[in-house]
Amino acid sequence: MGRLNEQRLFQPDLCDVDLVLVPQRSVFPAHKGVLAAYSQFFHSLFTQNKQLQRVELSLEALAPGGLQQILNFIYTSKLLVNAANVHEVLSAASLLQMADIAASCQELLDARSLGPPGPGTVALAQPAASCTPAAPPYYCDIKQEADTPGLPKIYAREGPDPYSVRVEDGAGTAGGTVPATIGPAQPFFKEEKEGGVEEAGGPPASLCKLEGGEELEEELGGSGTYSRREQSQIIVEVNLNNQTLHVSTGPEGKPGAGPSPATVVLGREDGLQRHSDEEEEDDEEEEEEEEEEEGGGSGREEEEEEEGGSQGEEEEEEEDGHSEQEEEEEEEEEEGPSEQDQESSEEEEGEEGEAGGKQGPRGSRSSRADPPPHSHMATRSRENARRRGTPEPEEAGRRGGKRPKPPPGVASASARGPPATDGLGAKVKLEEKQHHPCQKCPRVFNNRWYLEKHMNVTHSRMQICDQCGKRFLLESELLLHRQTDCERNIQCVTCGKAFKKLWSLHEHNKIVHGYAEKKFSCEICEKKFYTMAHVRKHMVAHTKDMPFTCETCGKSFKRSMSLKVHSLQHSGEKPFRCENCNERFQYKYQLRSHMSIHIGHKQFMCQWCGKDFNMKQYFDEHMKTHTGEKPYICEICGKSFTSRPNMKRHRRTHTGEKPYPCDVCGQRFRFSNMLKAHKEKCFRVSHTLAGDGVPAAPGLPPTQPQAHALPLLPGLPQTLPPPPHLPPPPPLFPTTASPGGRMNANN
């Protein structure tokens, strides 16, 4: 509420509604939510008109002073009531349907606890014969007026503007509920002379006396006279539940040093509202403005707030006056300088307060005499102050708290108003105070509290992470960042993979270890996946674009990862290493299969036949043999298969494709197992021809033996000569003839 009060006083542009008193032409900015929370009148008004931004109140019974005090109570939880403004506050509270404040003011009027009003105040006309009549019917029946169905309030819109509402009096004057004829203002003040005290105004016979018995009358200077020099202080403490906490009579004091008996402070009982020095100064300025407008002639008032924040006092200063005309002239002079000039002069006078307080027993509040011993209420108030731990006025002055009052002469001079040059200087000083620039950035603040908060949050207390350099406003955010992003490593229990965030581990367990259900499926092939991101990656398989090409062999791929895996075949790199035996592998699935050797068992085991597998892909294909599921169907013949590779192999029988060629003879095969068997056979024949070491014919090329090494292959001519390594046949006849031979031959 303190911040909202600052907006109301210094930043009216931030308020969302303006209260306008049409007869007086006064504007009061406020907040809808705050007004609706305290006043039933504003609650019903804003409920009916939700876009309302301007409320014009054309009510004769609503005065600016009363409305200002009501707003001060709503925003600061303190209501300052004296004999000068109690009727205005009561009227405003009754019209705005604030029953608690109206009841409290009515009780004060009935009990006559406020004393006679000051000069210029408007008092109700009372019969001169009796001084203690009952309360006027206007204040007794004000609640009935608010609830009477016969007097409805009129809400009239002004023109086509839907954001403005005018509230006027309902039926004018009604019998019994309108105040009686209010007489003219009766001035009541004293003229001090050497011979004594004489009355300068009319006789106060029509004014009510204070209750308190003969002893109280003696303190006030007798039953028939009223002296402000000898008056006592009456403090009435009332909470919002219309319960009077206690009524105490304060010590006697000098004129202007102590609060008048017409001053009563109404505050909340809990005392939880604490205000800064700036708010106290604002309240003082508002009170001074009200006194000047009402013409009370009571001078400036200072508000002194106790440590509990639940009780306050209002002090008045008496002005030297000799006649009613002179008093009016002094009031005009006081209205000349602004409230800011009075505030600056008051601060200058406060510096000389201690010196002025030592000059005499009447120089300050600390020099007041104790009340008479027969005053039981004064003793009770002092005991309550001691019980709360409130320091004495002298101790408060030593501690640098509220400064004591200056001497009467200085006070009267300041009340008349400082020179014009001092007033201009005070205005400049106040404007300088309202602008607090930041030393490190070009921002400017109207309040020092906002500047300090800006410095603490933006410049001074930025929390920086030592590892990554990120900046945080709060230390708790930095600690959370370190636990989640920088230092914390969460490992998977199954495979030991580390993660920085817990949700990454959950996703890993769902996808890799199969703890989750595949909820996302492809619209084309109805294949299911764990996440939608996997579905988008899978959609590449249905496209014909292959933008990734191998520079070595020219093979194209649809994904960049497939090209990286393929490039390992050409480079021979084995990036995956086993931590147990340091054996390296080219692919990650090979490492996973190898890890089953160290673990002692394979990760996936069939519950039907007990067969185990290293990879979940093989395990899923095996499980389809038990369930009989064959989701892959040939488009040509309609035959179904358990896996996609088997269906692709079968499709080659229809297309005649033979993608596997032999490196030795160039023959092509449809399946990889057929090529493998052919390579074994081809290698055995070629190895036998090369192991005999027979040189090739001189006229033949070196590849000639390879041409004769395949005599059994189909398609080759069968009239080839025998291999040259075979032994020659034996000769039929001997090359040399002997005599015996001849004889035999001849025989």
From Swiss-Prot:
GO annotation, cellular component aspect: nucleus
InterPro entries for this protein: BTB/POZ_dom, SKP1/BTB/POZ_sf, ZBTB47_BTB_POZ, Znf_C2H2_sf, Znf_C2H2_type
Family the entry assigns: Belongs to the krueppel C2H2-type zinc-finger protein family.
Purpose of the protein: May be involved in transcriptional regulation.
Acidic residues biased stretches: 278-354
Top-rank lineage group of the source organism: Eukaryota
Bias kind Pro residues: ranges: 719-733
Gene that specifies this protein: ZBTB47
Start and end residues of each stretch annotated as Disordered: 243-424, 694-747
Protein species of origin: Homo sapiens
Example of a GO MF term: zinc ion binding
Pfam family, one: zf-C2H2
Cleaved signal peptide residues: none
Name of the protein in question: Zinc finger and BTB domain-containing protein 47
Location (main, coarse): nucleus
Intracellular or extracellular location(s): Nucleus
Keywords of this entry: DNA-binding, Isopeptide bond, Metal-binding, Nucleus, Repeat, Transcription, Transcription regulation, Ubl conjugation, Zinc, Zinc-finger
Cross-link (Glycyl lysine isopeptide (Lys-Gly) (interchain with G-Cter in SUMO2)): 190
